[in-house]
Every structure is written in C-alpha cells, then in structure tokens.
C-alpha cells in the first residue's frame, strides 16, 4: 500500500506549522481557550498524546498472528487499548501542558510526527487488516488508522489557528 499522500501531508503540516507555532507570543499560547477550555499549549499537547497513542497502536497491531485477527489479550481475547478517547482531558491535565516549555512542546510534536512517518513507511503491509477494538467495541484496522491520522491532526491544527486569530 502506498501511503505517500499521508506521509507528504504530515510532512507539509510539520513544515508549515513549526515556524508559526514557535513564533506565537506566550500570551496567545497560554491565555486563549477554545470551547473545550483548551489553550494552544493544551491542544498541541493533545496532538502529542494522540501521536503517542497512535504510535503504540500502529506498532502493536503488527504483532497479530494472522491478518484480520486481533492479538490475544488475557482479559477479553482481543487487542483492546486503554480508553484514551474518553480520558484525553485527563491526559492533558496530568501532564500539565499549560506550564510546559513551549519550544519543548513544539519540538516533541514535530519529532513524534516525523517518527510516525517512519512507522508508516515501515509498516508490514500484510498486517494492514489487523484491528483493535475501540472503547465502543468497533473494529479499527491498521489501514484505517493510518488513513485517518492526518484528519485528526488537521482538525486540531485548525483549532489552534482559530485561537491565533
């Protein structure tokens, strides 16, 4: 499977946004909040958490013994990841992104996404149909995760830009 469009989209976002983010004044990144009560720092932290969780999923989904089957899990017999979707505000709070050094956050976001590109480029194509169960019990394939990665990234970059205005 050729994911060059996804890879190029991630690269383009990084190249475009890094400089913009690094040049934002402290007052804008910490004192403006969206409808979810998230600052720009918190939104970027959420994107780091998303990269982290998706990284784990992309790697672990390649362990599966057969295409289209879940990896055995002692609790439920299937690969089930912790419910990050329902806990992402708690992740933001516990990591205290609001008080993190901005340069560090931007660089972590950048380099985690560059690593995601490496993971996507190296994915075992025989494992693309392997899936995990989300918190609602829906099957999510490795292929679907890769295809949907930039949509989530672009969504929250858009939220950041709304707060910049």
At which residue positions do the language-model features occur?
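Short, contiguous alpha-helical
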Residues: 30-88, 114-117, 121-122, 129-165
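A generic "alpha-helical surface" signal
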Residues: 4, 8-11, 41-45, 103, ...
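Short amphipathic alpha-helical segments at helix-loop
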Residues: 2, 39, 94-101, 137-141
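Alpha-helical bundle segments that constitute or directly flank the non-heme di-iron/ferroxidase center
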Residues: 1-28, 49, 53-60, 148-151
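Acidic/histidine-rich alpha-helical segments that form the ligand environment
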Residues: 9-13, 81-129
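Short amphipathic alpha-helical segments, especially helix-boundary/capping motifs
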Residues: 3-6, 16-21, 31-35, 89-94, ...
